[in-house]
Structure formats: C-alpha cells, structure tokens
C-alpha cells in the first residue's frame, strides 16, 4: 500500500461523499486506501459510509475531536505515506499520486503540509493562504517593508 488517505467526518455526509468520489475519480497509478473516521455523526453518515466497501470506515461513538480522530485513522493505516484530507475537499487532479511521487523523490523529508488552491464556482482562484514562517519568509517580509518606506 503506497498511501493511506485519512478523512475525519462530523456531520458532513454530503461533503464527505463528494470528497470520496473525487479521490476515486481523480486517483490513478498509485495504490491507496481511504480511511474515514466518523466522529459520532448524527446526519445519517454512519448508514451511508458503513456500507461503502471502497473505504475503511471507523465509527467513534463520541466526538474525539479532529486530532484524536486522525490518530484513530493512523492506527488503521497500511500505507507507507499518510495523506490527511479535510472532508470538504474536492481533488481536481491526481493529487494522491503527485503526493506519492514527491515523497518518493524526497526521502529526506519526513513531514510536510500541502495547501489547497481554492476555486470559486467559475474556477477562479480565491486567495486563502499566507506564507509559512521560515527564515526566508521573514527576510522577504522585512526587505519588502523597507522597500516601501
């Protein structure tokens, strides 16, 4: 197993269904599993996802919170790499394979974060992010501040 995709759901059955469908439709050329951890949803999620053979469904009878629910998913994961995905995410490209390829080409990197490009209904980008704080980012911000004076 190359990648375990871990999703936490709490009363977002419709969004989570769309997320899962996008993973399946957009992912190829990589071996992956989808692990869905349900944080005691009351919106019918259990009835929908417990029957879905394409996913590994884990139901918690209490809301564990996001972090503990992810840890529950990690315990069940078989993949060499873990891909944490929010339930309201739709993949538009072969992101799981791109993630896997990056991990394989960069074995010295042990942890990473990937930010999404948000798009509106017309596929225009929505600015939704900033820079990570790194020495380079601090220097860049400091230099830019002095240029504007």
Model regions and ranges:
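Short beta-strand/loop segment that forms part of the nucleotide-sugar
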Residues: 31-40, 58-60
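Glycine-rich, basic loop-to-helix element that forms the pyrophosphate-binding segment
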Residues: 60-77
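Short aromatic/hydrophobic "clamp" motif used to bind/position activated sugar donors
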Residues: 82
